[in-house]
Amino acid sequence: MKIEMLGEFGYDLTLGAPFAYHQYINGVEFETINVKDTKPFYFFSEKHKELDMKRDMCYEMKVDGKYRVKRHNHSVGLHWKTLSHDKNLHEDLDHLPDKLFWHDQWTPPPYSAYYKNNFFRFEKPLYIISNKYQSEWDGGPVNFIDLETLDKIFEMLSPNFKVIYNRPKPSNIVEDHSTLMDFGDFDLIGNKYKGRVTLIQDLQSMAPQLSFNELQMYLYANCSNFISVQGGNSVLCSYFGGKNIVY
């Protein structure tokens, strides 16, 4: 079985990885195809191929060359074989059963158990703030934690927690159709919270052998407190249990 998942990050975590992991635990031979630095999400795949390309903006997954769900940029209803009364629009899904694919083939990978470690341990309990600031829907940023709110969060949490701020830079992750932007959050931390809030990029020096996504996984596995924003950010945080406040 060949599983090809080149869509957005959040869709990868909710569709591709659980489908592939289900094949793994059931002894099905499979290979996975994805973008760069996705092996951490498919640690169980012995045959994982990474392509040097951007992620597609759509929600899609191909299994043995055929769409497992309809290629589209909205997730609502996409797991159904028929998406409208016009069957001509969905002839490429005629091979699918009339049910949700995850009824019997959806098992989320145990990221927390697999990546739990004794390396990223700190004097205070971890609190990870996962943010983004990027173009969305052919417009400006929509889903993000603004500077005023970040300031309040940092002020509230830093006395009692090891606060790690995670907003990836373009050099850290594979981008999709969105453009990552700056908005002064790093300056806020550097000018007001130096020594109290740690950028995830600054932790890379502790383990330079890790890729950015590996670093995220090992950190998150030791954390049970998250604040995130809608999208792949919140999906990844939710994999690790504890409390995830989606802003």
List each language-model region with its residue ranges.
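Catalytic donor nucleotide-activated moiety binding site of glycosyltransferases and closely related
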Residues: I129-W137, L150-N213
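Structural motif
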Residues: M1-K2, L126, N225
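A nucleotide-sugar donor-handling region in carbohydrate enzymes
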Residues: V63-Q134
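A short, glycine/small-residue-rich beta-strand->loop->alpha-helix junction that serves as a flexible
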Residues: M5-L15, Q134-I145
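Active-site and donor-binding regions of nucleotide-sugar-utilizing enzymes
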Residues: M1-S84, L215-Y218, N233-L236
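A donor-sugar binding/catalytic signature common to diverse glycosyltransferases
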Residues: N213-Y247
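A structural signal for short, well-ordered beta-strand segments and their strand-loop junctions
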Residues: E29-N34, I128-I129, K162-R167, S228, ...
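Short, well-ordered alpha-helix to beta-strand connector turns
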Residues: G27, S45-K49, N160-F161, C223, ...
